[in-house]
Amino acid sequence: MAQRVTFRRRNPYNTRSNKIKVVKTPGGILRAQHVKKLATRPKCGDCGSALQGISTLRPRQYATVSKTHKTVSRAYGGSRCANCVKERIIRAFLIEEQKIVKKVVKEQTEAAKKSEKKAKK
């Protein structure tokens, strides 16, 4: 009959955080080895694609690694991917351009109205 293994921690239930792997020791005894949960890659906040250049760790482990492992040296580095940052910059530029165009058109219409009033007098 096969040798049985038991959980080594206090939690007796087969939960996601209490997973075990059965390992045979050099002495031939089967032991339960607790397995850590797999880390997921950080994702872009806009498009959801995996961020390049950022370590794949469990949340608590980010506190122990240096800043270079958690960010990239770019605007929104570590939060947004390069393509989304590019789109944001272009969108912001176009919005500012649109505001300027709107302002110029408004000034031109006001100038035209003033010239019409002067012409009528």
UniProtKB/Swiss-Prot annotation:
| Gene Ontology cellular component terms for the protein in this record | cytosol; cytosolic large ribosomal subunit; preribosome, large subunit precursor
Claim: Zinc is one of the keywords in the record: no
Which GO biological process categories is it annotated with?
cytoplasmic translation; ribosome biogenesis
Q: Which InterPro entries match?
A: Ribosomal_eL34, Ribosomal_eL34_C_sf, Ribosomal_eL34_CS
From the Swiss-Prot or TrEMBL record, state where the protein is found.
Cytoplasm
- The main location is cytoplasm
Query: Which Pfam families does this UniProt record tie to the protein?
Result: Ribosomal_L34e
The record's note on quaternary structure and interaction partners says: Component of the large ribosomal subunit (LSU). Mature yeast ribosomes consist of a small (40S) and a large (60S) subunit. The 40S small subunit contains 1 molecule of ribosomal RNA (18S rRNA) and 33 different proteins (encoded by 57 genes). The large 60S subunit contains 3 rRNA molecules (25S, 5.8S and 5S rRNA) and 46 different proteins (encoded by 81 genes).
Describe its function.
Answer: Component of the ribosome, a large ribonucleoprotein complex responsible for the synthesis of proteins in the cell. The small ribosomal subunit (SSU) binds messenger RNAs (mRNAs) and translates the encoded message by selecting cognate aminoacyl-transfer RNA (tRNA) molecules. The large subunit (LSU) contains the ribosomal catalytic site termed the peptidyl transferase center (PTC), which catalyzes the formation of peptide bonds, thereby polymerizing the amino acids delivered by tRNAs into a polypeptide chain.
Other facts:
Present with 23600 molecules/cell in log phase SD medium. There are 2 genes for eL34 in yeast.
Q: What is this protein called?
A: Large ribosomal subunit protein eL34A
